[in-house]
Amino acid sequence: MTKSVHVASALSVRKTATEDTVGSILRAKGNQVWQIGPSATVYEALSQMAERSVGALPVVSDGVLVGIITERDYARKVVLQGRSSPHALVREIMTPSPVTITPEFTVMQCLRIVSMRRFRHLPVIEEGRLCGIISIGDLVAAVIANQAFTIEQLETYISAGYPA
């Protein structure tokens, strides 16, 4: 009985990844938020995405998030429609008024949103301003890191209880 209580207390030292917040992920990523304006060309947006190895850019006008442009938007609204990206504007193909989250959202809440809505990116808003963007990759990385930590804690507990 004592061991199970000890295991529970050892594992409670760190919150689970599903309890980790978006804010903690953003702090680990750093505070750089790439963005683009609605009057930029799609070509400029794609160039920025390629240069920065990202799949989406928040679209900001006068400091306010007005949309998001993704690789998926480009594929569906430019390539499949036979349009020319050097002349298309971001505002013409962006997803307007995207679903947003706050730094207080948990990883599990975000995973539910991206799974149910089939999103890959969630802009993060704090006090009315864009403060970051979370990708499905960020969420998965948080879960994997937490699982690795849990495994390490269990291995330490087990090996401490039994001589090698």
Where are these regions (language model features)?
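Tandem CBS (Cystathionine beta-synthase) repeat/Bateman regulatory domains
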Residues: 1-164
